[in-house]
Amino acid sequence: MSKRVLTSVAWPYANGPRHIGHVAGFGVPSDVFARYQRMAGNEVLMVSGTDEHGTPLLVQAEKEGTTVQELADRYNRIIVEDLAGLGLSYDLFTRTTTRNHYAVVQELFTGLYNNGYMVTQTTRGAISPSTGRTLPDRYIEGTCPICGAKDARGDQCDNCGNQLDPEDLIDPRSKINGETPEFIDTEHFMLDLPALAEALTTWLKGRTDWRPNVLKFSLNLLEDIRPRAMSRDIDWGVPIPVEGWQDNNAKKLYVWFDAVVGYLSASIEWAWRIGDPDAWRKWWNDPEALSYYFMGKDNITFHSQIWPAELLGYGGQGSKGGEAGDLADPALNLPTEVVSSEFLTMSGSKFSSSKGVVIYVRDFLKEFGPDALRYFIATAGPETTDTDFTWDEFVRRINSELANEWGNLVNRTVSMAYKNFGEVPTPGPLTAEDEALLAESAKAFDVVGDNINLSRFKAGITEAMRIAGRANQYIAAMEPWKLAKDENQRERLATVLYTALQVVSDVNTLLTPYLPFSAQKIFETLGGEGIWAAQPEVVEVTDESPREPVGVGLPEEGRTYPVIMGDYTKQKVTWARQEIQPGTQLSKPKPLFPKLDPELAETGPEWAPVQK
């Protein structure tokens, strides 16, 4: 029976081009998952966008002497182009600086406020002694008081994942000029997490199928739960929709309050962009719908605690009760699973644009194409542990696995069939060896599919490649090149090549979620016509919204910007064996995965940072 599956993908921050570490965490895994779900016959809604609020953009805009919106516009376009080039099949990839997003964020806040889960409290805020300027928490860095990491931020330590306040830091310093900040009293809106703790605990304890590291970390957060500030002393962000606050341009909603609402606002935007304004409700209000959230491990807190708390409070499901808001009919669905990846490093160091330790997605795509990067991430990415990227490992995997194992299987199988028959040959009687291979290949659909469904992407692609290896062993044992020299063995030649072609078709289907670009080429080589694996498109749209936000500093109405969308219903691929038909005309195969120069294993391309 068909299911509805919401695939919510972490929002990349619009302060620069994305590097391969970013897409290893949120991009490729989520796309493999979404493509598989569509192939399996499920209704998928995959949403995300660029995150364009918060301190880092302000700091960078000041350094570059430009406005924050101009900076966000620049990198929004670059990120959209790069992610579309990688084949990430979003139904909508939008941005947080839209009028629709502001309005939906304000609706969530208002519901929480009306239900008593958003309360004001005087807290300690930081200011610059030299300028008197307010320093939001992400302007401040220092030593984490919990794990001792030296570069913890004023809202969170990325090393241990714990939430912090700026005054918690040991030896705090300003990111702008390095000076020690002063702390003064300031009033903010707090999300009353203690009032939602019981509901959060009940929900989390039912998530027994989550990755153990994610569940354990999330449950540990509840041991010291306290109200969390959801506003900031900053002039860039969503206005606070409360009288006396909404026209104060010096206070805005916290970037992480609005960023997680983006999954909902993007779904709502997608619905009215396709002309069916209530379509989003099928994924958000139907209790049978499933929702999966993909991100790096540094964002677990916001997806397993803050976002569920916002949803519960908006629905009046905390200890204070309350009325469900207009978007909850009867409720907004909580995450089915939070799928967190670990970090991808480079030669043992964290990716860092400022330090030159970075490989940008667009540079990688120009040099090697999308499927090479997708393959490396799927087979060697940081699925459950931190993983190190080296050019040596990349070259080895592309040459020995993708080119030698899979590319060689396709090339020699189709080449022999094309040379000897020009079409898919009609087989004779199948031997035990033929039937065994075909049965093993057919069984792989369940194995690979189950693994992808459980977010075990490495295990899935490993099984698909194992079948490719078995087919290569079969061809080596059957020796069709010898059969081709004996006219009396022509029927047996046809049978062997038919069997091998069927397995090539099977493996191509199994690899389609992982390698959609080469899958389309192989489909055509095997005589297929039309769209096998649909790709996303970049579309220019106008910022307009059926909901009107309030306050000062709103996005300009009517401006245009790029989004990623796609019609994935037009593709032919399904998650099942496609029976090849004798007589189907074949095409002469072309090299799919050119072997990489072994010298690249030493230092990578000329544009790449030098490995140490």
UniProtKB/Swiss-Prot annotation:
Renumbered ranges of motif 'HIGH' region: 12-22
Molecular-function GO term, any one: methionine-tRNA ligase activity
Residues that, per the record, bind Zn(2+): C144, C147, C157, C160
Cofactor(s) the record lists: Zn(2+)
Region called Disordered, residue ranges: 580-612
Motif range ('KMSKS' region): 350-354
A GO term from the CC aspect: cytosol
Keywords carried by this UniProt record: Aminoacyl-tRNA synthetase, ATP-binding, Cytoplasm, Ligase, Metal-binding, Nucleotide-binding, Protein biosynthesis, Zinc
Residues that coordinate or bind ATP: S353
Subcellular location: Cytoplasm
Keyword Transferase belongs to the record: no
Documented EC number(s): 6.1.1.10
InterPro entries: Anticodon_Met, Met-tRNA_ligase_1, Met-tRNA_synth, Methionyl/Leucyl_tRNA_Synth, MetRS_core, MetRS_Zn, Rossmann-like_a/b/a_fold, tRNAsynth_Ia_anticodon-bd
Top EC class, one word: ligase
Entry's Gene Ontology BP terms: methionyl-tRNA aminoacylation
SUPFAM superfamilies: Anticodon-binding domain of a subclass of class I aminoacyl-tRNA synthetases (SSF47323), Methionyl-tRNA synthetase (MetRS), Zn-domain (SSF57770), Nucleotidylyl transferase (SSF52374)
Cofactor-binding details, from the entry: Binds 1 zinc ion per subunit.
Principal place of residence: cytoplasm
Catalytic activity as recorded in UniProt: tRNA(Met) + L-methionine + ATP = L-methionyl-tRNA(Met) + AMP + diphosphate
Task performed by this protein: Is required not only for elongation of protein synthesis but also for the initiation of all mRNA translation through initiator tRNA(fMet) aminoacylation.
Subunit-structure text: Monomer.
Family per similarity comment: Belongs to the class-I aminoacyl-tRNA synthetase family. MetG type 1 subfamily.
HAMAP family: Met_tRNA_synth_type1 (MF_00098)
Protein name: Methionine--tRNA ligase
